Every structure is written in structure tokens, then in C-alpha cells.
Amino acid sequence: NSPIMMFTVYTCIILISWIGAKMIVVNSLTTGELMSLLTYCMNIMMNLMMLSMVFVMITMSIASAERICEVLNEKSDITNPENPDHEVTDGSIRFDHVTFRYNKTSDTPVLDDINLSIASGETIGIIGGTGSSKSSLVNLISRLYDVSEGAVYVGGKDVRSYDLDTLRNEVSVVLQNNVLFSGSIFDNLRWGNPDATDEQCRHACDLACASEFINRFPDGYNTHIEQGGSNVSGGQKQRLCIARALLKNPKILILDDSTSAVDTATDAKIRKAFAEEIPNTTKLIIAQRISSVMNADRIIVLNNGVVDGFGSHEELMETNAIYREVYESQTQGSGDFDEGGAK
């Protein structure tokens, strides 16, 4: 509507000026009166334009409000059981013949007959090609989705028996593209634990190798972070998010390709700190780089939603063709996992 309105305004100005000029020539209108007339007309036209914009905004607001109400009124399929458990005893995980579909009517499962047993405190690497359902696998642990068949057990109990808040408070997830909020570094860290002391925040940052760059800031931990973390690098953002997750003191820590923007030396320091400082926390590390998982206790190789291999680095090098192919491609300077192998 803006070009049409502007065309109308300028057309009115031209007509008033043209007619007014003729009237001035025959002395039926003064120059001052013409200028006043133009000013009044401009004010009227501008107010009409504002009014039309208000109507447009109201229409857009009503449509947005309807969509928001639809989301707020949506009922979640995942709810608490009648008598939920409020304590997760340890970080052990077991997948018992788990099959999962995003669409219940789909014939092809995303995960098919997964059987895994992970002891509390183990460090487990997970690798696989794009679309091999690595993230889908770990999302079942905190009940972001429910299994289609089988069951997932945490601490020896079916995850569906837990209170949702209790379960999710014991599972920390660090994604590849996490979010930082506007505020100081301390403020961002305390999203993981509002009651954390300054010393606990500093210790978490030491484990995540974030203190290395924080101490170089003039304001240290009081440095202001812009919305979305736009004033820190990708690697710095990932390390802050890892520190934030550690502050929850979870029984299960999931790192979903969360060190992809971190150099290999820093990545190794973080993994070493995890092994020494949080030995009782079960750690699941999803990665594309073999170097990020090769020192894990065991490694899961996923291929098209099926466990293709599960064992230590040495065992998989001997028995699993996909793992061996990716390892060889990366040690020769290639890089990323692709469907069913290396790219």
C-alpha cells in the first residue's frame, strides 16, 4: 500500500500547487494561503497513512495471536505418569529393543531394534553419517520423544516412570548451536544452576576450558554477552555452554557435536578434565571427528538408524568396516562422515 499512498500524496500536492498557482495569478489566493493549504493537506494525508498502517498491524497482530493461542493450547503427548518417581539413582542407561518413529503411521523407523547397555560413569562416543539418527537416539533418554516400541531405562527404571522435571534435571544436553542470552557471563552460566556460587562457576569454566579466554576479558566473568552470544566466537560460545551444563551436576551429560568449533587440542583438554573431575557422570559424546571419541570407553556406530558396531576404538578398528573407513579417511586429511561411510 505504501507506493499507492505516496502516489496519492504527491498527486494531491501537484494538483493543489497547480490550481493554487492559477488562483494566485488572478489574485484570488495568496502565497501564504497556498502554503497553509498544502500543510493542512499533508497533515491530513499523513494521518490517513498512519491510520491505514494501524489497520494493517491490527490484522497481523490478530493472526499472530491466533497462532500463539494454538501453540499454548496444544496438549503434549508426553506427560507425567500417575505416581511418578522423583529420584534418579544413577546415570546407567539401557535401550531394550527400542524402535522409534517420528510419525506413528510411518513404515520406516528412524531407529530400529536398538539394544544397548551403558554403565553409570561410562564415556560413550556416538558416530554416524548425516541422518543416521544420532540425535534422535539421545533425545529418547530425556523423553523429548517417547519410543514407538521397546523401552529406555535410566537408573534401572523406565524413563516413562519418572517425573519429567526430575528426569530432565538429571540430563544435561549441549547442542552444536546453543544459545547465550544478553547478560554477564555469570548470568549465562547460572541458567544451568541459579544457586551456583562464583567459585562453582569458575570451576565449571575451568573444566570446559572457558576460563582461558574469560580471564583475558577486561571485566572477566562480568563481561557482557550480547543476545545470542554475537560478541564471542563459536568455540567460545560452545565452551560457555558446556560449563553451563556442568553446573547442573547432572548424572548424564550429552554433548551433541558441541566441540565442533573447538580446536583438537582444547577438545582433548576438555575430555581429559571430564574423565578426571566427573568420573561418576555418564557422558555421551556425539561427534564427527574420530579424535573426539576414540578414547571413550566404548563407541556406538550408527548407520541408518541401526547399531552397526559397539565397542572400544581398538575393537571397532578390527571388526567394523564403517568405523575403520572413517578413521582412515580422517587420518589422511579428509573429514566428515557421510551416509554409510566417509566423505
Q: What is the predicted role of each segment?
A:
Residues Y10-I13, N80, H86-K343:
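ABC-type nucleotide-binding domain
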Residues G20, N27, E74-D77, G91, ...:
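Flexible, glycine-biased helix-capping/connector loops in cytosolic signal-transduction modules
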Residues E70, D77, R190:
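Conserved E/DxxT/N motif and adjacent residues on the DHp alpha2 helix
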